[in-house]
Design a protein with these regions (language model features):
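Short Lys/Arg-rich cationic patches that frequently serve as NLS/NoLS or arginine-rich RNA/DNA-binding motifs
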Residues: 1-8
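Short, charge/polar-rich alpha-helical segments
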Residues: 8-30, 42, 46
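Non-transmembrane amphipathic alpha-helical segments
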Residues: 29-43, 60-63, 67
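Soluble, cytosolic/nucleoplasmic coiled-coil alpha-helices used as oligomeric scaffolds and tethers
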Residues: 46, 53, 70-73, 77-80, ...
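Short, charged, amphipathic alpha-helical segments
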Residues: 50-59
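Amphipathic alpha-helical coiled-coil segments
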Residues: 58-78, 101-108
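Amphipathic alpha-helical binding modules
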Residues: 82-143
């Protein structure tokens, strides 16, 4: 072992391999999120019952969550196993363009998920069954 080199811990290696495995599924998870978004928008456009819209909204939320987790895993995998234990190594690696691409994609997906959670969910079917009225904030135009 060369002087100055740190040995990668077993936990860091295991975390790295788990992230590599999750990152390998990113394209599939992103496609699933796009399909879930398309199905949810279609249910909204056709005026499907609220129970159907709510189920599609939940599916979209789960798909966006999975895709976001995979993007962050790809970011950590791009940094490498040394980044799990060494914060300076991780910080330097985060400055590379390859890691920036994954960070941007993960933050884009996270923003989509948060926007969907804040404004995309229809009323819960249980509220409709109980005869509860859901307050809606009127849309305002931004100047």
């Amino acid at each position: 072992m060369k002087k100055g080199r740190t040995k990668i811990s077993a936990t860091a290696e295991a975390d790295y391999l788990a992230d590599v495995a999750l990152a390998a599924n990113f394209d599939q998870l992103l496609s699933r999120a796009q399909l879930a978004d398309q199905e949810f928008r279609e249910a909204q456009a056709t005026g499907a019952p609220l129970a159907v819209q709510y189920a599609r909204a939940r599916d979209l939320d789960a798909a966006l969550t999975d895709a976001t987790r995979a993007a962050y895993a790809a970011q950590r995998a791009e940094i490498g196993p040394a980044g799990y234990d060494d914060r300076i190594y991780r910080r330097k690696a985060k400055a590379t363009s390859a890691v920036h691409r994954w960070t941007d994609e993960a933050e884009r997906l996270l923003t989509l998920r948060e926007t969907h959670r804040l404004s995309g969910f229809p009323a819960r079917p249980q509220a409709d069954a109980l005869g509860l009225e859901i307050a809606h904030v009127p849309a305002t135009e931004h100047a």
